[in-house]
Amino acid sequence: MMYDNEEELYEEENAEEISHELWQEACWIVINAYFDEKGLVRQQLDSFDEFIQMSVQRIVEDSPAIELQAEAQHTSGEVETPPRFSLKFEQIYLSKPTHWEKDGSPSPMMPNEARLRNLTYSAPLYVDITKTKNVEGLDPVETQHQKTFIGKIPIMLRSTYCLLSQLTDRDLTELNECPLDPGGYFIINGSEKVLIAQEKMATNTVYVFSMKDGKYAFKTEIRSCLEHSSRPTSTLWVNMMARGSQNIKKSAIGQRIIAILPYIKQEIPIMIVFRALGFVADRDILEHIIYDFDDPEMMEMVKPSLDEAFVVQEQNVALNFIGARGARPGVTKDKRIKYAKEILQKEMLPHVGVSDFCETKKAYFLGYMVHRLLLASLGRRELDDRDHYGNKRLDLAGPLLAFLFRGLFKNLMKEVRMYTQKFIDRGKDFNLELAIKTNIITDGLRYSLATGNWGDQKKAHQARAGVSQVLNRLTFASTLSHLRRVNSPIGRDGKLAKPRQLHNTLWGMLCPAETPEGAAVGLVKNLALMAYISVGSQPSPILEFLEEWSMENLEEIAPSAIADATKIFVNGCWVGIHRDPEQLMATLRKLRRQMDIIVSEVSMIRDIRDREIRIYTDAGRICRPLLIVENGSLLLKKTHVEMLKERDYNNYSWQVLVASGVVEYIDTLEEETVMIAMSPYDLKQDKDYAYCTTYTHCEIHPAMILGVCASIIPFPDHNQSPRNTYQSAMGKQAMGVYITNFHVRMDTLAHVLYYPMKPLVTTRSMEYLRFRELPAGINSIVAILCYTGYNQEDSVILNASAVERGFFRSVFYRSYKDSENKRVGDQEENFEKPHRGTCQGMRNAHYDKLDDDGIIAPGIRVSGDDVVIGKTITLPENDDELDSNTKRFSKRDASTFLRNSETGIVDQVMLTLNSEGYKFCKIRVRSVRIPQIGDKFASRHGQKGTCGIQYRQEDMAFTCEGLAPDIIINPHAIPSRMTIGHLIECLQGKLGSNKGEIGDATPFNDAVNVQKISTFLQEYGYHLRGNEVMYNGHTGRKINAQVFLGPTYYQRLKHMVDDKIHSRARGPVQILVRQPMEGRARDGGLRFGEMERDCQISHGAAQFLRERLFEVSDPYRVHICNFCGLIAIANLRNNTFECKGCKNKTQISQVRLPYAAKLLFQELMSMNIAPRLMVT
């Protein structure tokens, strides 16, 4: 399209702009496109795909070839060199998830089959091996072993290699899978496991911290780690000593600077390290540290360090100095120098390079670290913040599994080497298939995923615990939230408040509301809705590009040039300097927006004040999409939005938006160098009133800073902040439909609400959480009213008639499982109906409900301690004539009983074979849970309450329309908690039910306010603030107050009285102390603790105290010798007593004391301490 003059062009552009009114819809179209393409667990899937497609191959290729040679045999004088073998592992292949039955027949494994049969959903891994045989004087012989099986890798559901990845909703339904299930978890032994993202400090980054009080005033540290390498991180510290013991002034000039190198026990003066790298002259060293010699302050700071290292002036002397302080003392000087060289080359700053000839680069980097230290101590650059989220990386499934696989593959290679070496030493050839122990990888991965101990099974105490967790399936929202969880591996008992606090840099990356209460507060976090975690990309294209774009290499420049130029870092490694940083940044940004050379997840930061450009391409950076603003207007135009609206037909998608440079991903560090407008309205403000005119980006919608659980809350911006946190925790316990295929699943526990409703008042974000399709609550008519006093202290009154009609009724499923395992020896297990005549150890329970095959039939009502699975174990035949009385039993009972506190109906029975090929059975029992007094309910604003009483409709208060509320809550619940969102939701719901449309309660939305809602309500003839006149249900008289009433969305939580009720009169006791057991499951007693004891003492209730702590707990009697006070021998049958020590047979008293006290006395006696009881 050609324009005659510029004005037309300008008008055309203006027409393209999105107006403020249209923006309310436009931004949600963009967000829709994002979630359509990405879903909510993309970060898990992408990370796993990266592991399968890249990391596994890289690990296999990086492992060195196995070189084998037999010991030379000196037999007949002449020595012949035995043949040499080498094994190289090459290309890997991953098949589709497969299951091999016991008879060896393979079949594709479907996830639901894996869940039901307790299998592991994993795919076989194959590798090509090249075997080379070198015999002296002959050509090497190469043999290829194609596709050798080396183990199975668990597959993440819905990832590229999963069987479900490309299926349509219909196909999924036919496979008994829920189309709404997001995937992102593994199935290990039939249970669903999710890998929690682990937070860690970023490697290869220089940090400067000031030390409060210690021998150092400042500390610079860098934890170097080669990208994708098995070597553990090696840390280098460059520290500035504190002056004396008196308190350190921060402006203290001239302290010694020392380095702490890996594997070197003592501190090494920094100048000696430089000399060991081959920079001997003072001037050379200083050039690498202080780039500008006209800086007297800095020169002054390094003086003491120069003086300290004055004695060492040659490289070898310096190397010897370092080597002497190394691990092995008492070796020759050459050895020491070699050792020091090795450490400087391999262990110090390995990310700069571990090959030869990296000395210049290392010297520059070390100089840079000292430079940073000096800047910090002079107060010219602020210190680093440990809790800044830019300094953090998240390890997802990919890096975690790669770490595990690397170790296991190493073990596998070790085993192969040992096995083959044995054969070669005997002069035989070996079979590769037998040399490879496939279960090393299979079992290693399965063990870590099953237990959550991340690391080697043999060193379980070193491993991180709780990395893999069982996926929470209580509600759909709790599942989604669990898949997006982030964990900081800081000890939960630490009293440090800093890591737990909400840091500014978390904006838009992690949810500000969703964190647990108690010990883990602030350490367990959740991703915000649009946050994404980078999977990492290769830095090589960027390095090549920089070479072309006039970046000067460190080896080629004069050190004096650095002072004026800008340093360039790629992934923390200093690669060079550049004279025109602004131009370079513009070019880099342009390339990233066109997705040319540079991937969209790469971040680039230009620190203008410190003259640095930092580029990061590594994995685990958390980033989020923002709209790009240029010259004060959005690059997103109406045409883009129109195209997105039609994206089902025209192949337009989120990815196209990113590729066309309208949206870009910004990570936490880069976010600090850009200027973000909250909405396009900010861009359009008058120049005179505007807060800023140089915006570079714009938020898509501020509601996207919230996470999964907080996005369900209506009007969260009108609630006090801890209330949102409480609801985020409670939303995970609400009952609803947790997944659509629950009828074919055999979950251990499941709660399903009878009539879930979608809320009348929703947020726009809910669509992506599928809360409309899988809701967890009911729109109930709620009155806020003091009525009969049965709703004091956060209890609620329910309408009994509504409950009879099915209000908040739910069904509870519990599964029981058992299998016929083969025992050691000739004991075998069988499912059958045990008979009292032949079976030992049968309980007095109902065995007659079982069928003849030993398994209960569906539809039978069962109650506590009924048998659901009958199983017997054959006893070994005993040949002794003595035990003639036990002879009649040939079997022992090993049945499964229903939990003693539950009742229900057998819902479904499944019989199949497990992975070992044994008979395997799962039984699901259902019970109906009707709301009753003591059950817990909550609104979506952290307003939880238990049911205090239920009144029939006739006894409830009612309005003039005859409307009786379902729930009455107490007005005292509102003022101190300031949950205004609760009230606005009620008002909005009242309007919505009259208007016949769903209310919008998205946070940070200017379009909705109380004023508008009130005006509309008035049009429908209601009181503008939602109050009603009500009448007392008992007397029929008008209540002397206006009552706030309307529909509010309430949730039923999983805490029910039936699962909690517990009492005990008599029951089992512990064997050791003979005191009652603990806990409801074991029918235990209630503990009368120390504090209760103290109260009774202060009351002086001595007899009651004796009864509680002695008579109803563990009474016991012993006989005590009156002379020595020790326990005597008593034979009550013959009435003979004697104390062996005193030869006393008459002076003996009976003493009653707690059994625990008797045990303590005897344990003391075993330690040679005699507690003597003085009896009179």
Curated annotation (Swiss-Prot):
CDD domains named in the record: RNA_pol_B_RPB2 (cd00653)
Gene Ontology molecular functions: DNA binding; DNA-directed RNA polymerase activity; ribonucleoside binding; zinc ion binding
GO CC terms of this entry: mitochondrion; RNA polymerase II, core complex
GO biological process, one term: transcription by RNA polymerase II
Chain residues that bind Zn(2+): 1121, 1124, 1139, 1142
Signal peptide feature range: none
Binding site for Mg(2+): 794
Segments crossing the lipid bilayer: none
Main EC class the enzyme belongs to: transferase
Entry annotated with the keyword Protease: no
SUPFAM superfamilies, per database record: beta and beta-prime subunits of DNA dependent RNA-polymerase (SSF64484)
Compartments, record wording: Nucleus
C4-type zinc finger segments: 1121-1142
Keyword Manganese: no
Catalysed reaction, written as an equation: RNA(n) + a ribonucleoside 5'-triphosphate = RNA(n+1) + diphosphate
One Pfam family recorded for the sequence: RNA_pol_Rpb2_2
Biological role: DNA-dependent RNA polymerase catalyzes the transcription of DNA into RNA using the four ribonucleoside triphosphates as substrates. Second largest component of RNA polymerase II which synthesizes mRNA precursors and many functional non-coding RNAs. Proposed to contribute to the polymerase catalytic activity and forms the polymerase active center together with the largest subunit. Pol II is the central component of the basal RNA polymerase II transcription machinery. It is composed of mobile elements that move relative to each other.
Note: The binding of ribonucleoside triphosphate to the RNA polymerase II transcribing complex probably involves a two-step mechanism. The initial binding seems to occur at the entry (E) site and involves a magnesium ion coordinated by three conserved aspartate residues of the two largest RNA Pol II subunits.
PANTHER family: DNA-DIRECTED RNA POLYMERASE I SUBUNIT 2
Similarity section: Belongs to the RNA polymerase beta chain family.
Subunit architecture: Component of the RNA polymerase II (Pol II) complex consisting of 12 subunits.
Protein name: DNA-directed RNA polymerase II subunit RPB2
Gene name in the database record: Polr2B
